[in-house]
Amino acid sequence: MLKEECKALLDALNKVTGCYRHLVLTIGGTSDSQNLREELKKTRQKAQELAVANRNTLTSTLKDHRLTKEDKAEFERLWVIFSTCMDILETDMRRALVLGQEFPLNIPKKHLIQTGMSGGTSGVAARAMSAQNMRYEAEHNIDVMDLKDLENEINLMGEMMYEMEMKVSVPQWTVEAKQDPGAELKSIMSAGASSPGIISLDAHKSICDLSKILAGVVFSAVLIIAIVLAVCVVKLS
């Protein structure tokens, strides 16, 4: 039961961290707005709440000497995944801080970047918050005020990760993966290969091979023509 609870918490953190990264990538773009900055703040806070819950559960579990060898190996694997999520979250928080400083909303220093993206980001934020719709209630200067909070939270995140390493030492290279690299992606591709509009991995590979062959033939033909022309020029001269 505890194992399933840890997996559920980790899945939730994974989802929210992914949504946060998606939102961070839109800072400074044409989709940037006050609503986006509020979505970033709420999503970041949700991720930190889940991070604390994951840390508490996994730390107390891994310090339990009654764990069997199999259970310990599984929880260590979950710990490594959790640590990776934390690294990603901290990296994205730092990126959000830099971009937020470069692209303030009310006193713009630079023009917004034409990224090609359009539309709002409320759907992504709502998914992270597990809500149907987002409610916006932030002040107009959230783009400036939140940067101070974000900077403090980055420092707290670093302290939290340091404390984690001191309490539980699980070297990543000692944990064995349960699947081969890319196994999950391959299973998703094979499962969706029969769906309409989805090209299978093998078909995609065949198309790529055909394109390479065609490119090689065209290049060879151009090279031969160039050689013939060069010979003709030499003879005529």
From Swiss-Prot:
Coiled-coil blocks: 29-58
Main location (coarse class): membrane
Entry keyword set: Coiled coil, Membrane, Signal transduction inhibitor, Transmembrane, Transmembrane helix
Cytoplasmic side: 1-212
Keyword Cell membrane: no
Residues spanning the membrane: 213-233
Bilayer disposition of the protein: Single-pass type IV membrane protein
GO cellular component: membrane; neuron projection
Subcellular location: Membrane
Topological domain ranges for the Extracellular compartment: 234-237
Gene Ontology biological process: detection of light stimulus involved in visual perception; G protein-coupled receptor signaling pathway; negative regulation of signal transduction
Family: Belongs to the RGS7BP/RGS9BP family.
PANTHER family: R-SEVEN BINDING PROTEIN (R7BP) HOMOLOG
Function: Regulator of G protein-coupled receptor (GPCR) signaling. Probably acts by regulating the activity of some 'R7' family protein (RGS6, RGS7, RGS9 and/or RGS11).
Protein name as it appears in the record: Regulator of G-protein signaling 9-binding protein A
Organism this protein belongs to: Xenopus laevis
Chain's gene name: rgs9bp-a
